[in-house]
UniProtKB/Swiss-Prot annotation:
InterPro entries: Deoxyhypusine_synthase (IPR002773), Deoxyhypusine_synthase_sf (IPR036982), DHS-like_NAD/FAD-binding_dom (IPR029035)
Enzyme class, spelled out: transferase
Pathway: Protein modification; eIF5A hypusination
Main function: Catalyzes the NAD-dependent oxidative cleavage of spermidine and the subsequent transfer of the butylamine moiety of spermidine to the epsilon-amino group of a specific lysine residue of the eIF-5A precursor protein to form the intermediate deoxyhypusine residue.
GO molecular function: deoxyhypusine synthase activity; protein homodimerization activity
Pfam families, sorted: DS
Residues of the active site: K535 (nucleophile)
Organism: Leishmania donovani
Subunit record text: Homodimer.
Biased composition (Low complexity): 440-451
Protein name (Swiss-Prot/TrEMBL): Deoxyhypusine synthase
């Protein structure tokens, strides 16, 4: 017994001591406290979420480098077995071609209303993989669905409008960092609205009115005068037109639909919706004119997917903004000069009205094209169309576009006399003065709202969500290496992870979220749970940074992606005639001459 106890207690700990010695010691910076980059560079050894961020930074750096493709597994006798690499005729293992991973990004809609929108736009606009600028061939039939979609939409644009969709823009010299973006409903609408009007910073609803950051002026945080006056009015009084309370999420506010400040966005969205419905009517008529096929096809050929909707928006954006700017400015000028009578009926959502007004809008839209281009270049959807990056939106109907697609209900008629309400004055003079005052207040409210656009009559839009699910799943399955950058949670996280499940998981995963796993929701789940589902590969690198996305995403951008772009540009300047690389070992070509499937040389 003594020998048994001695052998159980007196165990050699040499191996454990060696393992402990290899662990990273916790330490922070001891100098250079005036250099932010030095402080952030030491996050990896500081502990807690600083260490997780340091790991996310290292994973992001690996995401944008060339490396061997993912390992391939197959099920044999109920177990996953690693498929050995191909062997040549001489019996030697063939060298695998290194590729750049395809990066899938998930972004929740609220982030597009913050400064994270500019970070997402940078990731779409810039990249490190050079684009082939040689003469291009048409898209091949074995290309990915997004390649074929953009090629088809560009041909359709040329046939409809007689020119290329982006005549004012040069083709980017590099492919986008991203191959696909998944955004929740309302995200693209935030992107478009911010190109039309400014979002402002205010205090949180749970905070006192004066409790704001020192970076936000007190004037910006104070509610508008119209809101102050309305708050002073007794309950039940009617607010003046154009003083609708701004929409708010967190400490960010923006003009509500139909209110002052939202005229350009409203006109833009109505123009967009009318174009979508007109296009669908053309496609439907063309489909009905074709003979009935022998083989039944259960895919509606004239329907539209959410990714197709936002691709069309990116292709049409400059034209629509120029048209909307012309309509809004001309209507505003007529209101200012006092020569407008019935402006709500004379200007429709897409500038169509009386023939004279229509010709005037067409003539003036060209003069607004420079401003429209400048506004469009600030958006994610514009650069996504230019870089041929699909914007998937599985919760499409949650966005603001639905309110422009559905018919607007007419307001209920107000009764002349209500029980307990004011009694009509029998004095005719007082009645005339009352009418005069109402007319004056109506005139002032009309000038305050600047533009009242008559909602167009639109048909129902046939939307197909299943085709988008198939497209993103196919894109992940054909990718030789993938990474996931998920900002937030919910439907965008599930959609990106589920697509990578179809290829036995992503190789690199970064999740930025403050969601917790304790309620069992997908939004707060850790990467380890995704590993159990097969959404993250067994040999993959993954990390979850617990924190608010607007804190960590700009840091990740500044430390990883911006330096990579600077290095690529420096290389381009030093070697202007350097041979450009294209994506993929077997690259299907699109109309711009580059492959989009997998990046490699």
């Amino acid at each position: 017994m003594a020998n048994i106890a001695e052998s159980a207690v007196l165990v050699s700990s040499a191996s454990s001591a060696q393992a402990v010695a290899k662990l990273t010691q916790v330490r922070g910076p001891t100098s250079g406290f005036d250099k932010a980059q030095h402080i952030i560079g030491s996050y990896s050894t500081m502990g807690f979420q600083a260490t997780n961020y340091g790991l996310a930074r290292s994973i992001a750096q690996r995401m944008i480098r060339k490396q061997p493709p993912s390992k391939v597994y197959q099920i044999k006798d109920g177990k996953y077995v690693l498929v050995p690499p191909d062997v040549g005729e001489d019996g030697k293992t063939l060298q695998q071609e290194h590729v750049y991973p395809n990066l899938f990004m998930g972004v929740t809609a609220n982030l597009m209303g913050t400064g994270c929108r500019e970070a997402v736009r940078f990731l779409v606009q810039e990249g490190v993989v050079h684009r082939s600028l040689e003469a291009s061939a048409p898209a091949s039939a074995d290309g990915t669905d997004d390649q074929l979609m953009f090629a088809r939409l560009k041909r359709e644009y040329v046939e409809t409008y007689g020119g290329p969709p982006h005549p004012d823009e040069e083709i980017p010299r590099a492919h986008s960092f991203l191959c696909a973006i998944v955004v929740s409903g309302g995200g693209v609408e935030h992107d478009l609205r911010r190109a039309c009007t400014a979002y402002t910073l205010h205090h949180y609803a749970s905070e006192a009115q004066g409790h704001v950051s020192s970076t936000v002026s007190s004037e910006a945080t104070a509610p508008p005068k119209g809101l102050q006056q309305r708050a002073e009015k007794p309950l039940g009084t009617r607010a003046a037109a154009g003083t609708a309370k701004p929409a708010r999420f967190g400490n960010v506010e923006y003009p509500r639909q139909g209110s002052t400040g939202s005229e350009l966005f409203d006109c833009l969205m109505r123009t967009f919706v009318q174009r979508l419905c007109a296009r669908q009517a053309r496609l439907r008529a063309a489909a009905m004119a074709k003979p009935i096929p022998d083989k039944y096809d259960d895919v509606c050929s004239w329907s539209v997917t959410p990714s197709e909707v936002w691709a069309l928006c990116g292709l049409w954006l400059v034209d629509m903004l120029a048209e909307a700017l012309g309509a809004v400015r001309s209507c505003t000028s007529r209101l200012t000069s006092g020569s407008a009578v019935g402006t709500a009926e004379s200007v429709t959502a897409n500038g169509k009205g009386p023939e004279a007004d229509r010709d005037a809008h067409i003539a003036t839209s060209a003069s607004y094209r420079a401003e429209a281009l400048a506004r469009a270049r600030t958006t994610v959807v514009y650069w996504a169309a230019l870089q041929q990056v699909s914007l998937f939106s599985p919760s499409f109907v949650d966005g603001d576009i639905t309110s422009y697609l559905l018919p607007t209900p007419a307001p209920a008629a107000r009764p002349a006399h209500r029980k307990g309400g004011p009694v009509a004055d029998e004095n005719a003079g007082n009645s005339k003065e009352l009418k005069r005052s109402r007319k004056a207040s109506s005139s002032s409210s009309t000038s305050a709202t600047a533009v009242k656009v008559k909602p167009p009559v639109v048909e129902r839009l046939q939307v197909d969500l299943v085709r988008d699910v198939y497209s993103i799943n196919k894109l992940a399955m054909l990718s030789k290496k993938t990474g996931m950058l998920i900002c937030g949670g919910g439907v965008v996280k599930h959609h990106v992870c589920n697509a990578n499940l179809m290829r036995n998981g992503a190789d690199f995963t970064i999740i930025l979220s403050n969601g917790q796993e304790f309620d069992g929701s997908d939004a707060g789940a850790k990467p380890e749970e995704a590993l159990s589902w097969g959404k993250v590969r067994m040999e993959g690198a993954f990390v979850k940074v617990y924190g608010e996305v607007s804190t960590y995403l700009p840091l990740l951008l500044a430390e990883v992606f911006v330096p990579a772009v600077r290095q690529r540009r420096a290389t381009d300047d030093a070697q202007p005639r350097r041979k450009r690389s294209s994506r993929g070992a077997r690259p299907p070509q699109d109309v711009s001459g580059h492959s989009h499937l997998c990046r490699g040389e």
